[in-house]
Amino acid sequence: IHIINSIMVAVDIIGGFLYKNGYGPYTGVPCSILSPLINYIIENPKIKFYMATSEGEAMGIAAGFTLGGRKPVVLMQNSGLGNCVNALTSLHLIYRLKALLLITLRGEEGIPDEPQHQIMGKKTFDLLKCLEIPYEIMKDEKEKTIEQLKRIDKKIRARSSPFALVIRKGTISNYNLKDSSQCSPKYPLSRRKAIKIISFNLSNKEAIISTTGKISRELFYENKNREGNFYMVGSMGCANSIAFGLAEEKPDRKIIVLDGDGAFLMKMGNIATIGFYSPANLIHIVLDNESHDSTGGQHTVSGRINISEIAGNCGFKSSGVVLTDLELTAAIKRALNEEGPHSIHV
């Protein structure tokens, strides 16, 4: 059992070493444990970070960086390791493409964590061994960490393939953004208020599937005694596909899915499937704050895409954007009384 150490490594020690030794660009999907490092990167104009929509995509981006002569760094939570197994086994390991994987360890045995991390927490090291990806656990003292990074750098150069550095909770010290405005866009309708409005306009007849993160938590706080709610705690990006499967099996019941922009982007192909089969009873609501709020507020790429147009072009019967409580109320009432599928972008 690992005991969280009160001694932590300053994030500029890690980021500084990697920069001086030619590592970068960075890509990946954020985790709260990695927030300090991501904040450090955001404030360093010499380091580029590309926010990926999924871990598998991040490995593809990293492969391109490697082919371009760079030494990429891929950030991910261990829960996302499964999302990139194919890219690792059929791309990076086959073509011997180097990359430094910074993988956070959630669900470590003996440390309280959320239930969705329990199984992967126990199997992370077994999975890395199975994939024949060498790994080390990051040291929690400055001098030891520097020596470790030097050793790993030599191994990556010699082996020319991925190497994983696993980071436990409490290893990296905090690092706050001096200017957090770029990660905190302002909206006329908050997520919490939107969930209240949605809940108020539904009866007990509809089923609600809510995505992982703060959306499920806030829906639970809003109406935890409501029957017909399914609160996802993991499997990011799967809420709308769960809703689709349920809608197909229960055609006489309205199925509402509360999605987030990060989850929508992670498995955007789901929208094409839903549009193709066109379940008339499905209402897909995307609560978009352009950020991964539950992992520290890092930006997503949703700010430059039109979610409602994507849904419309994929075959949804109706799709639109709402900005105010009155617009959201009207959109919900219309969707409940007309055949779908419907897409509401909040």
Which sequence ranges carry the predicted segments?
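Thiamine diphosphate
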Residues: I3-K129, I133-V346
